[in-house]
Amino acid sequence: MLKDITIGQYYKEDSLIHRLDPRVKLFAVLIYVITLFMHKAPATYVMSLLFLIITIKISKVPVKYILRGLKAIAVILLFSVMINMLFIPGKPVIQFWIISISAEGIRTTIYLGSRLIMLVLGTSLLTFTTTPNELTDGLDKSLGFLNKVGVPVHEIAMMMSIALRFIPILTEELQKIMKAQTARGIDFESGGLLKRVKSMVPIIVPLFVAAIRRANDLAMAMESRCYHGGVGRTKLKPLKYEKRDKIAYIVLFVFLAVMIYLSFFSPWR
């Protein structure tokens, strides 16, 4: 399960998506998330899925690597499916004892499940194709206007970047601890759910200690380099829009217009 946690990890590749300005990719994620919650017809789900598939193909990130991240949300997805199928009222199509599953429940489950899957895959693609430094610069530039009203944009962007960077680091640390505990005879794989949960208890304290140690090392490194926020900082590689970024913006606005039409004006809605 631990090796399936891919969120926050950067996949190094030379693709058009990787070369896009991080501000474009942040805007793309925003547009994609907004359109996911606009879905009102099967055509909108098909369009969102098609857009995601094309983007993944262009990014050159292996499909297996991207889909691996879905295992981390399998429990949430399963819980959502069960709740919607069992508790949404309607004309029953499956009746067993006190369990009743309606056509509306099945339809809602399919819609919500596909929406959650596309949401996770779409947002994960941002971290797969954008380094933490690029993500920080992109957020800093995109939300820079909030500095005028006293919002510490650079600090917020830095915290988000550090949090994303810590996910794979802590995952690696957890794997090391589990291997050490396995060498001492603890079995994490066999047994029921309750037994597996109990077997995880001995690794909680070492993991917290490792996390605190890593955070302290990072704080000392930043302090030794005289980090004092974004005031007066310069960039080694300043962000600059290229022709491909402008074309990407046009594609995103066209996609948004199509989704608005399919959601509110199309005869298929």
PLM regions with names:
Residues 1-44, 48-57, 144-151, 155-158, ...:
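Transmembrane alpha-helix interface motif
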Residues 25, 63-74, 248:
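Alpha-helical transmembrane segments and their helix-start/interface "positive-inside/aromatic belt" motifs
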Residues 51-61, 76-79:
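Alpha-helical transmembrane segments and their membrane-interface exit regions
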Residues 67, 71, 107-111, 201:
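Alpha-helical membrane-interface segments at transmembrane helix boundaries
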